[in-house]
Amino acid sequence: VREEFLKRFWNSAIVSVCSSILAVGLGSCAAYGLSRFNYRFGFMRNSDISFFFLSQLILPPVVLALPFLVLYKSLNLLDTRIGLILLYTLTVLPIVIWIMRDQFSSIPTELEEAALVDGLSIWGAFTTIIMPIALPGMVAAFILSLVLTWNEYFFAALLTSSHAKTLPVMVASQTGSQGISWWSMAALSFAAILPLIVIAIILERYIIKGMAAGAVK
């Protein structure tokens, strides 16, 4: 059981951390563009594009089950960590974009204008000026993404069979011929929750700053 737990724990850790980092990186770039530039895609403007990202959360996971199952089977991504990382990145990306868009909107544009006058490019101003200021929001988005991906069960149970199974799938499988093994399930659940509690305590000040950013003007 110990070896099985460690294997599932590392699967969850690798998948959750990688997908959260990827989502925060991509989401921050998208959110910065939506907060600073005026886009037009057909009839859609910035606000419509932002709402489109948020509307992806309306779809229940079961609606996406069959398409992803067929797609992953054709791409040989079933029961792989990279498959879960890509899927989890897509699932938390809309939330990251909304959090970071509000974060970037609360930062004065004069800072970037001054950086451009000093000779920096837009990308240089974003990476050296804006990102350090927006760090609390990025940490908050990372923690939220980490919690959501760490606790995700449906797709992990659907798209994995042995190698890439995660901790929630192992916790849910604590059943036998005599029913549910409550002691084992309780111990595994505590072990699964503990890392998130430790991370939240360590990064508490960033979470508070990030979630409060943009609340007042």
Where are these regions (language model features)?
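A structural signal for multi-pass alpha-helical bundles of membrane permease subunits
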Residues: 1-217
